[in-house]
């Protein structure tokens, strides 16, 4: 119960900051990871190791999208804190749920901007270029005119909470 309260508080604040400021503060993510590891440490060395492995796996899984500019640094650090709570086994399901929520948010944003056709066309072109040449072609930055961004902290928050409680809501 304490872990559920700590995780939902962390994620609620992360979502709030991401929606309001488009950034997730380091103090929040570090405190979240610290809380996860302390709570796991109380349960024993095995639980603590599980939390460290979950945090490490979250870092490994989120680095590729970060290097491609698909995630911000705050998103990565929030995912690492989530990994500390989830552990490596539940983290895989959480990442899939987060990706589904993030995809739905991106689709809604494209529809809101009336840019769904353009987004689909660019996505196919990017995949085609990657398949033909083994690397990504032109990728507009977030500062490019008309760049579409989604506050991924919202996807992380919703996806993580749904998966946490679906998996039992305990460390």
Language-model features: where?
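A membrane-topology feature that recognizes alpha-helical transmembrane segments
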Residues: 1-171
């Amino acid at each position: 119960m304490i872990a559920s309260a700590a995780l939902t508080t962390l994620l609620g604040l992360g979502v709030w900051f991401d929606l309001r400021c488009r950034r997730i503060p380091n103090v929040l993510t570090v405190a979240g990871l610290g809380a996860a590891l302390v709570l796991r440490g109380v349960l024993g060395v095995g639980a603590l190791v599980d939390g460290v492995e979950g945090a490490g796996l979250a870092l490994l899984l989120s680095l590729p999208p970060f290097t491609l500019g698909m995630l911000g640094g705050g998103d990565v650090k929030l995912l690492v804190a989530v990994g500390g709570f989830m552990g490596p086994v539940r983290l895989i399901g959480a990442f899939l749920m987060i990706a589904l929520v993030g995809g739905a948010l991106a689709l809604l944003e494209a529809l809101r901007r009336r840019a769904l056709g353009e987004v689909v066309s660019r996505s196919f072109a990017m995949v085609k270029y990657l398949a033909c040449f083994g690397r990504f072609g032109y990728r507009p930055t977030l500062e490019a005119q008309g760049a579409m961004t989604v506050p991924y902290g919202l996807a992380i928050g919703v996806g993580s909470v749904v998966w946490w409680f679906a998996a039992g809501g305990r460390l």
